[in-house]
């Protein structure tokens, strides 16, 4: 995803949602503690119109370090199980996005670190780059039409606070630099 930056230190919110970054999630491997990837299963057919279709699709965890592979499949929804996605085969539980663990296997995200007394996290490098561009900007433009559902509009106040900018940017850069080979 290309982050659009206007002249100077102005940032224009591209209007993406968190689920845009949930197709490839970097996690800690449960076997070797190395970097692993959680992604939509390669055998899964394309054709979903809505994000919830991708969120409830089968996912696979793969670790290039130790060759560990694990499969995740959607669970049938039952009362009290959270949000449901209704399909021809019956309702499915929609994985809950957000937080420093992946929504499928519950593994710690690879891109996470303490920051400002909280935990800074990102699903992948493009997610981290979007956060960096937003936090670094002196001026931030909302998308049109403005809504409250974009990833950036829903960031916690501590990440948006000007007083935390230097610490948040340092943490983001540390995470990003740790990703370089």
Model-found features: residue ranges?
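Conserved aromatic-histidine-acidic binding/catalytic patches
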Residues: 17-20, 51-54, 116-119, 123, ...
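Extended interfacial segments that mediate partner engagement and assembly in macromolecular machines
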Residues: 75-141
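Eukaryotic non-globular, compositionally biased segments
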Residues: 109, 143-145, 179
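Charge/polar-rich, low-complexity and marginally structured segments
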Residues: 125-134, 145, 149-162
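C-terminal, charged low-complexity interaction regions
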Residues: 151-181
